[in-house]
Amino acid sequence: MMLDLGNESSVTMFILSGFSEYPHLHAPLFLLFFMIYTVTLIGNLGIIVVRKVNPKLHTPMYFFLSHLSFLDICYSSVFTPKLLEILIVEDRTISFKGCMTQFFLICAFVITEMFMLAVMAYDRFVAVCNPLLYTVSMSPKLCAFLVAGTYMWGVLCSLTITYSLLQLSYCGPNIINHFGCEYSAILSLSCSDPTFSQVVCLTISIFNETCSLLIILASYVFIVVTIIKMPSKGGLQKAFSTCSSHLTAISIFHGIILLLYCVPNSKNSWLVVKVATVLFTVMIPMLNPLIYSLRNKDVKGTVSRLMHLKLQAHST
């Protein structure tokens, strides 16, 4: 849909192409993504509930993990419902305001999660390198400050990038070659010079990726040095199990981001971008609860206890 503004026309509605080139895959993809989204909600809500009901998990590490789960629910819920909708209905439209809102939210949640993972790396550094002063160093006030800072920074960065997109003119075409309002897909529809927006996005992206990775790298360099100096195998095993889940989550998260950065800008690359975005917005939120809970005895023990209590309640 176009709105006439003098001699120009402005787009008021976008059409999401999704996976329209593969109509025969729509039904199986819908079932697959619906199951993944259900597991994502159950898994991440489970982490939040488990942390609340088990006093042993009222530690900085699980405080940050519960916020990571909350972010996974949020950014998965921004993209996945719309993806499911365009797979089963013919009307694949999204309003201009709706599109920009979706982009703002996904951008804010992803940047916040990026720095939440960096904060968690710092938390692991303090836990391994200074265990005796861990509870003092990672005080509730500091934890709240770090979490609030990540949310505020994510919102600020997202507002800046979204503002740069809103300064562009969109006078047609209005078909977004994606299943959601992803930055490069929106930018490709602009009929004005996108240089300012590209510079803003590139600057913020490079700064955020570099800063978060430097915090993570510095934390784990100190952790590795501390582990090497440990005399007992028990301490080494405990330190490794503490960090392995977080390292796995970081590798998947940043690996897919770097893949998206490295995709060449060509027509053939759009399928790669779509698949990578699906992995990022649909798969990662599902995997994080599994990564953090499978090797964690406290989490598994709490889940087993809750299930046992529920079964007892049903049997009585």
From Swiss-Prot:
Keyword Glycoprotein attached: yes
Record-level GO cellular component terms: plasma membrane
Organism: Mus musculus (Mouse)
Protein's recorded name: Olfactory receptor 1165
InterPro entries for the chain: GPCR_Rhodpsn, GPCR_Rhodpsn_7TM, Olfact_rcpt
Keywords linked to the UniProt accession: Cell membrane, Disulfide bond, G-protein coupled receptor, Glycoprotein, Membrane, Olfaction, Receptor, Sensory transduction, Transducer, Transmembrane, Transmembrane helix
Chain positions carrying an annotated carbohydrate: 7
Membrane topology, Cytoplasmic segments: 51-61, 123-141, 229-239, 292-316
Coiled-coil regions, chain positions: none
Residues in compartment: Extracellular: 1-28, 81-99, 167-205, 264-268
Cysteines engaged in disulfide bonds, as pairs: 99-181
Similarity-based family: Belongs to the G-protein coupled receptor 1 family.
Gene name of the encoded protein: Olfr1165-ps
Membrane topology, record value: Multi-pass membrane protein
